[in-house]
Amino acid sequence: MAHRWLILALVAAAAPRALASPGPSLNERQSDDEPFSPPYYPAPNGGWVSTWAEAYEKAHSIVSNLTLAEKVNLTTGTGIFMGPCAGQTGSVPRLGIPNLCLHDSPLGVRNTDHNTAFPPGITVGATFDKSLMYERGVGLGEEARGKGVNVLLGPSVGPLGRKPRGGRNWEGFGFDPVLQGIGGAETIKGMQSTGLIACIKHFVGNEQEMHRMSSVVTQGYSSNIDDRTLHELYIWPFAEGVRAEVGSVMIAYNDVNKSSCSQNSKLINGVLKDELGFQGFVVTDWLAHYGGVSSALAGLDMDMPGDGAVPLFGNSYWGPELSRSILNGTVPVERLNDMVTRILATWYKMGQDQDYPLPNFSSNTEDEKGLLYPGAVISPIGVVNQYVNVQGNHNITARAIARDAITLLKNEGDLLPLRRNDSLKVFGTDAGPDPQGLNSCADKGCNRGVLTMGWGSGTSKLPYLITPQEAIANITPTAEFFITDSFPSSVDANDEDIAIVFINSDSGENYITVDGNPGDRKTSGLHAWHNGDELVKAAAERFSQVVVVIHTVGPIILEEWIDLDSVKAVLIAHLPGQEAGYSLTDVLFGDYSPSGHLPYTIPYQESNYPSSVGLLQQPFGQIQDYYTEGLYIDYRHFLKEDITPRYAFGHGLSYTTFEFSEPALSVVTPLDSAYPPSRPAKGPTPTYPNTIPPASEAAWPAKFNRIWRYIYPYLNNPQADAAVANSSKTYPYPDGYSTDPQPPPRAGGAEGGNPALWDVAFSVQVTVTNTGQHSGRAVAQLYVELPDSLGLDTPSRQLRQFEKTKVLETGQSETLTLEVTRKDVSVWDVEVQDWKTVVGGEGVKIHIGESVLDIRTECEVGGRCVTL
């Protein structure tokens, strides 16, 4: 999401052409060189999943009594800066339905006070700890609920990390669909356990910040993705989120296969709502609404923040235009009823009808009193900030995540952990505070002091910050600090001194440019910012023992100094949030052994990546971003091309050592067929009269006090609009548009897809023993290798599961059980449009280790298990 209100949105994207097949695959082509997203109409109704039945029944009762204006009011935002939240819908006061508050961010409540700034997703992913993923979700839910937020805009599982320089990779959990999927699902479960509605984003193909948005000058880029790649990589984590019963899905700005995501009927109607069985509501990213009728027919349910192509004028593609489209018969009444039913069913399912708080903060001002509608020329004034403290004890969870994510890349001579009486000299501005003050940059749009998070809408204010400088000083008062990015000439270096050098690499969202980087790491590349490499080299020249601490949004090139003799230890502390200092000293001084693992690959050089994942730029015309690398991103590419990385995906050392032994595999649900059993039939969905409502339902109420710019559902002359329905005028519907229901997709049947896909095919056990001299935790990472008999080019190893041990003392063991589902050992069959596996699992190999290249045990289905 972005609040850059000067961005202009393109009015509409080209309509797709019709195909004869009732179930075409994504990116079928009209010609050899033109991507194509086939039509999929009509929008499937929600309510057929049994676990949502009660919520849909309640919603049906309400929707049956709503007027046209009230229905439209719940689908349309009130306008940018027209309320306390990033966006809010209209309300239905007579039935007790409030404006629904939608607000950022995935790591904490944005632009407010007395909140927790949790570590971002990339840090959470590095823990490889499902319990911490869930606990953070609970914390996010409790805080957002406490502030009166109905929908928190997170978690983010798109971008997936296809482009290493991508600006918002740090908001997600790692560069792998399973790591993203598990991280997203656990976060959703935690968030929604509190009654908050989670909003998984960005669906889909938002892998680059530059040129993602459409304007009156140019159209946002098109991510051109083949059907198999889209299913096996980019949709995978969204399927896990839908299976976790996520309440809402945010649509991305960009096109996919030359059709805008917000009106891409194949993606929303066909994949998300029909194949994945999504029961909640679909919302735009902010100002990502490019057409009114087209998006409604394509399955969009809510428009945020409500404005049309030119914001701040009170115009909308929906609002009164949606009322008009219903009255003149362009948009079927059934479609509007389903939109509103989905929104209210989600509200009921989370229990938000029961004493749920109203917003008690304003994202527009820090003052207690302020404008209620800051975007209006004349606005009433009232209390907008009540300064409700929602932090609770969430600092404990935040510190645990930041600590358990710390990834030890190198530790020669066991220099770490440090002793409290070591002679330490600390270098780098990344160790210290922002000299201009805490939260001095809006949305973290600067890189000063320790890097706690990237920049953009996916941030929150820091309630406090203990920097590494402060934390180290509290433990070793004799440490000397040089908070500068130029190595001081006056530093004395003794043999017993240990230099700790702090460096970082930042990125963020495209509406802010920092040091020449417009969101994506365009200028900096994958290198340290602020002279970081030179600072390390200078310290390595003067000191015989150097520890490097890196705060980074993603992969970073280390080659200028990583092999220098004096660089003994390297830690990646990722993005630690508010607990940057003590989470680091917990590990540096040995109170905890590092247990984080890389959620991405660190290459020797950027040229190790395929050329297709570089940033794309052009001043005019639509950028066509072809995903020609297919399934081969990050570690999958390195394995395929036999490129040894500097540090592999999943790599992470400890202060101790672990042995993996006694692997065992058992068959749980036999894979008796190549394809899953037949999907369950759809249950009934709510039904309503489909007659066009009276025009009077969209008329302005008498003596209504309008607020200029506020988006209302009312029409000045609704009778004239209603008369059009009986005229000879017809709307130019997209090619392929139909109101005839589609046959149920064979890969569907429940939330996430055919429930048989999650049948446990194999259970794998492995015993992990601490064989070192320090307590610690190990991560067992399970990778699947599929046989050539499937007849498809498939990555040689794919992460499919992971488990983390408890803290193991020296000599202590724990047996871990990792489950492998049917889907885990399947590929997407483009022709059949279903998931295909090897009958009996014959030839499937299961690898377990501490990274993708550090495999400790191997099992072959139908064969034996061995320890390597």
From Swiss-Prot:
Keywords carried by this UniProt record: Carbohydrate metabolism, Cellulose degradation, Glycoprotein, Glycosidase, Hydrolase, Polysaccharide degradation, Secreted, Signal
GO cellular component: extracellular region
Residue ranges of the region described as Disordered: 21-40, 731-752
SMART domains the UniProt entry points to: Fn3_like
Catalysed reaction, written as an equation: Hydrolysis of terminal, non-reducing beta-D-glucosyl residues with release of beta-D-glucose
UniProt xrefs under Pfam families: Fn3-like, Glyco_hydro_3, Glyco_hydro_3_C
GO MF term set: beta-glucosidase activity
Signal peptide extent: 1-20
Pathway(s) it belongs to: Glycan metabolism; cellulose degradation
Broad class of the protein's primary localization: secreted
Active site (UniProt): D285
EC number, UniProt record: 3.2.1.21
InterPro entries, A to Z: Cellulose_deg_GH3, Fn3-like, Glyco_hydro_3_AS, Glyco_hydro_3_C, Glyco_hydro_3_C_sf, Glyco_hydro_3_N, Glyco_hydro_3_N_sf, Glycoside_hydrolase_SF
GO biological process, one term: glucan catabolic process
Localization, UniProt: Secreted
Glycan attachment residues as annotated in the record: N65, N73, N257, N328, N360, N395, N421, N726
Catalytic class of the enzyme: hydrolase
Family label: Belongs to the glycosyl hydrolase 3 family.
Cited function: Beta-glucosidases are one of a number of cellulolytic enzymes involved in the degradation of cellulosic biomass. Catalyzes the last step releasing glucose from the inhibitory cellobiose.
Protein name per its UniProtKB record: Probable beta-glucosidase F
